[in-house]
């Protein structure tokens, strides 16, 4: 029984098979799936061959993310034996009308875009936590959340306007009001 593979998976496996030959002469890309360094707890590869293998693994992982959401590209690569050519069963299936390529469910695509969007928006907007010597700190730390853009912007305006308020109270020129445009 032949395992059904989509066109994109077949292309990805072909890229794994062919790209390995560009930087290594060992002939078996499966040996390079898992990084094994000489020293047990080494954080970075030290030799040129180890760096090339690490870069190749990174590229294959990124290519896998383009067409599959399983987050386990190594198991996906080792899931079935593949020799770089289509088998007879697959070629006969394609001539008789192969099943269409599996589509990613819409909710997975929406979830991925939503996560990327919110990560980009909220990346630097997390407010500073209250000081630890504040009375009732233990209650404040539980409810501490992300600040919205409007809250953060109002805080910035408030701290920026403090010197102007002092000048105005002393009889100086009233501070200019900023045009507030919220995105």
Swiss-Prot record:
From what organism does this protein derive? Human cytomegalovirus (strain AD169)
Q: Which domain of life is it from?
A: Viruses
Instruction: Spell out the family assignment given in the record's similarity comment.
Output: Belongs to the herpesviridae US1 family.
Official protein name in the record: Uncharacterized protein HHRF7
Q: Name one Pfam family in it.
A: TT_ORF2-like
Q: Which gene encodes it?
A: US32
**InterPro entries, per this entry?**
HEV_TT_vir_Orf2/Gyrovir_Vp2_N
Q: What is the lineage of its organism?
A: Viruses, Duplodnaviria, Heunggongvirae, Peploviricota, Herviviricetes
